[in-house]
Amino acid sequence: MTIRELEGFYKGKRVLVTGHTGFKGAWLCRMLGLAGAQVTGYALSPPTDPSLFEIAGLEDCMDSVIGDIRDLKHLREVFDRVRPEVVFHLAAQPIVRDSYKDPVYTYETNVMGTVNVLECVRLTKSVRSFLNVRSEEHTSELQSL
């Protein structure tokens, strides 16, 4: 798909991306910005230094909100302010090894954080499209601890 084709759908649309400071989220925001979308991101601070988010200069071409999807009140405030038409949910704790080290944090983020995003989508009348993106890693395979 070309940027021109993406423009046909996204130009001028209000798009909210959770996890925008991560690798996939940063690339998605870059493409959405090039397609003319009004992009707002909601995520923890960039996970690496330097990060793709910073290298790509995304902080200068989008609205970046630092927050935690486990914080329903703050997330709801952002949804109310932005009134997104499209929501991409990429925020997660994606590292399998880390999930073994801190399963409670992983559950709170990946399950309850997603519940919070879905609740905000449900309560935000402007949302017309929602996409939930997951990691390429899977905890279903047994790995040595």
Model-based region annotation:
Residues 1-140, 144:
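N-terminal Rossmann-like NAD(P)+-binding domain of SDR-like oxidoreductases, especially those catalyzing
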